[in-house]
Amino acid sequence: MGNIKQTFIKRTARELFDRYPDKFTRDFEHNKKMVAELTNVTSKTIRNRIAGYITRLVRMKEEGKIL
């Protein structure tokens, strides 16, 4: 069993994904750079968790699991 993501990570990721849907891809490294550009997150750990969740959202959208 994995860990559950914290609420502020999910909220921030969803807001970024809704606001800039064309800027994110399935590539984690690209998403990591975009999160760094679009937010003022200073912590690498938080930035990576947000980018990872956005990568998951992109994959789920492509597979038709979310609208």
Curated annotation (Swiss-Prot):
What does the sequence similarity comment in the record state about its family? Belongs to the eukaryotic ribosomal protein eS17 family.
NCBIfam families with a match to the protein in the record: PRK01151.1
Does the keyword section mention Transit peptide? no
**What are the record keywords, sorted?**
Ribonucleoprotein, Ribosomal protein
Q: Which InterPro entries does the protein's record reference?
A: Ribosomal_eS17 (IPR001210), Ribosomal_eS17_CS (IPR018273), Ribosomal_eS17_sf (IPR036401)
State the PROSITE patterns in the record: RIBOSOMAL_S17E
The region annotated as signal peptide is none
State which gene encodes it: rps17e
Q: Name one GO cellular component term.
A: ribosome
The protein in question is named Small ribosomal subunit protein eS17
Query: What superkingdom does the record give?
Result: Archaea
The GO terms this record gives for MF are: structural constituent of ribosome
- Pfam families in alphabetical order: Ribosomal_S17e
Family matches, as PANTHER family: 40S RIBOSOMAL PROTEIN S17
Q: Which cysteines are joined by disulfide bonds?
A: none
GO BP: any one term: translation
Self-association and partners:
Part of the 30S ribosomal subunit.
Q: Which residues form a coiled coil?
A: none
SUPFAM superfamilies, per this entry?
Rps17e-like
